Amino acid sequence: MKRRPRRKRKALDIILAVICASSLAAAALIGWTIPHEGAVYSEISAEAGSAEGGGIDWEALRARNPDISAWVSVEGTPIDYPVVSPREGDPQGFYLNHDFDRNWSFAGCPYLDPRGTADGRHALVYGHHLNFDSEMFTYLRDAWRQEKFDTLGDMYWSTPAGGTVRLHPAFSLSVDKSFAGIQRFDLTDAAETRAWLADLSAQAGARAE
């Protein structure tokens, strides 16, 4: 009667050891993959040029991936990435786990909500919050707090048709992706856009002075 518990304990120890080994292997894989993907985006950034430096090489980016729609960078943060538009036939959220080269990726690639356009009044960009502060949109995870919001510099938003626009952050709020306030893509004029922004600002956790 005493042997069975020992067999069970031994089996449990083996299972736990396997789980532990698997977890360590996964951690090692993630630990290698994220810096590797960061290097890939550094390479793309070097090839594309800089919005702050005067221009983006859209031809080079299109040659690498025709899904390119914009480039976003934010002063004072590591954010400096191409922004893509999923192509017809891509599964929903394709770029959440595929990089700019359309290879499988933990970090993914920032991409536009297909209901908007890069040069429209409302361009909603999706990007990951990872456990690495220097990757994707992780720096923005606490930007709805005033003290973090105040560290954000100006944003450069570049598109092939519109050139580069320099924008100052106006406010920030933390909401679910289904939040009704960010589902507006039918804004027709400046007055309607200002009213929409004023409504969002009233709900914000942080605002510019």
Predicted segments, located by residue:
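Sec-dependent N-terminal signal peptides
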Residues: 12-22
